Amino acid sequence: FFKHRHPGRFFDVGMAEEHAVSFAAGLASQGLLPVVAIYSTFFQRAYDQIIHDVNLLRENVVFAIDRAGFVPADGETHQGIYDPAFLSQLGMPLYAPSNYQELNYWLQQLLSDRFHGPRAIRYPRGGQDTALAEFGCTGEDYDFLRKADDATIVLVSYADELADLLQAERELQQKSIACDVIKAVKLYPFTDKIIADLSKYKIILFAEECIANGSIGEHLEYALQQNGWNGRFIHCAVRNACLPHASVAQIKQATGLDAAHLVQAVQMAVTKGENLL
């Protein structure tokens, strides 16, 4: 679509991700604002250029990361589970919209004067989940999707994993376990506000379609502890870096990121409790 409307502003470099990033850095150094659209799984090929050509020089580049999270049907090599971990190491602003409205809004924001330097937005393969489309876009860094007056447990996630989180919340409610639900849009860096809001809870479950080591959840737990929080943090993420060729539902079940496993994780935390509730 963009290529046909703006042929002079579209450059297809083929399967040369390293060149794509260095090329974008050169454009940015001349005052342009390039958008680099690459699959998450191929984005890692350009990590050297992301660090040295863009991040260290604070070049004005927007990274649009496609196929983020679990990817069905494309094989083992196409899982987009590493970019939150390796981008958060650079302190780069990272956003993960959960529906079309958020994607449209935040991409426009990243292209505005509100930001300067490298920044990234990630989105999954396929269309939006109907369960998430209804929430629209508030323009906030995070939103409460469910909020109870007496909840001491909060479930947090981003992008497509939120659908399973909402299903888990409904099942927990039926078991008389009240949980709030937070939809994160800005993944990193964390704001003081979200740290303050999360610090009010005794149990936090953070679920993400990402490798656990270096992930958003791992950074969040550390930030909370540095802020003096001493509650129970449940991190549901990918512990085995090699995922099989399978459907998203099968991968979620295998990695413990389906609603059933999330419910079980919260129930175990409540049962063990350590007098937190």
Residue spans of the language-model regions?
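Thiamine diphosphate
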Residues: 1-117, 127, 274-277, ...
